[in-house]
Amino acid sequence: MSNCVIEAVLIRDAHYALPPGAGTDSVHINSEYCLAVTLLKSCQGFLGTGIALTLGEGNRLVCDAIELLARPLVGMEIEELMADFGTMSRRLADDPSLRWLGPHKGVVHLALASITNACFDLWAKSRGVPLWKLLLDLSPEQVVALLDLSYVEDVVSRSDALAILRAHACNRAARESILHSGYPGYDTSVGWMAYDNDKVRQLLDKAISEGFRAFKLKVGSTDEQRDLRRAAMLRERVGDDGIVMFDANQHWNLEDAIRMGRELGKFKPLWLEEPTHPDDVRAHVVLARELAPVKIATGEHIPNRVLFKNFMQSGAMHFVQADCTRLAGVSEFITVSLLAKRFGLPILPHVGDMGQIHQHLLFFNHIAMGQEVLFLEHIPHLREHFAFPAKVSGGRYHTPTEPGASCDLKI
């Protein structure tokens, strides 16, 4: 393997207008997706691409933070960097001139997500393999060397992480069939808040014809009866065998979340997502108790492994919606996946990357650590902007074959 040295860090502030109504929910009403893009230029000509999602003008703040945070990477050889990436990740996260802005959350952590994802993309490209294969080819020791386990050692220590990976190494072949069958998806794009019922029905029928069997609807309207009418329409349209989820995007206080959760529970959802403020662990504990048997899903706004640990320890979540564009990238996503495995919880990522990177990570999670196969969220709105958009057909994500993490953007 020849040396692949990072020569320069380039940054792109990418904004994409969405079709009217797309991307809207109870809190976020603008139809725009933005990506804070890190580009690692190497001496061999490879370009490592990393992304973090935002929804508007704040994207430039993340780009500014990338410029400040990524400076230590220039001049580093990618194999040497990734051989002990956990140490570098902690060094960047604890930069003494920037840590005060977090720590481990907000603009600086989103910047670290983009930088980290670019490192993994460059690493996979330099080896000529897709990210899922690069990760599966690593030994348990090499995987653990990628991780910053600080502040979660009380639950998953280095020896615990190694034990999980080693325990599932002997029977990995039995799970590799997922690479041929593909990973099941669920469709979020049918149920945006601004869509009227006719639009939802039209998109549902299209998604069903494309092989999807699970669908998410945005709730948290100022008109609660509208939420209930839309929920009834969704359940009627997909039938008793279809799977539905409801997403409030943090709109309700605890009292409203309990009341509306009970009403929406009549439509037998797989989960109720982000029912209240994403930092309120105690409120989620109460909701998990009061809304049973309805399950609680959250994670897209949980910024780090420590808060995920707290949610899991408290029994405040049933479905873990970690996002490698919100966490500190691929490496912290793997750490959260190990935490979830420890607590027996499934990982169903929020796709701030539109599923591009997460498809690799779920193939890895299932094969390497025996994570249950459930669903990967599908949001197709940026497909035309990716050089290698995720291959989705028959309601499944099919295994990516191109080298890298699938987040190259068309310039």
Short names for language-model regions:
Residues R262, K268-W271, H277-A405:
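Shared catalytic-loop signature of beta/alpha-barrel
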Residues S2-V244, N249-I258, R262-K266, F386-I411:
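N-terminal capping/lid subdomain adjacent to the active-site entrance of alpha/beta enzymes
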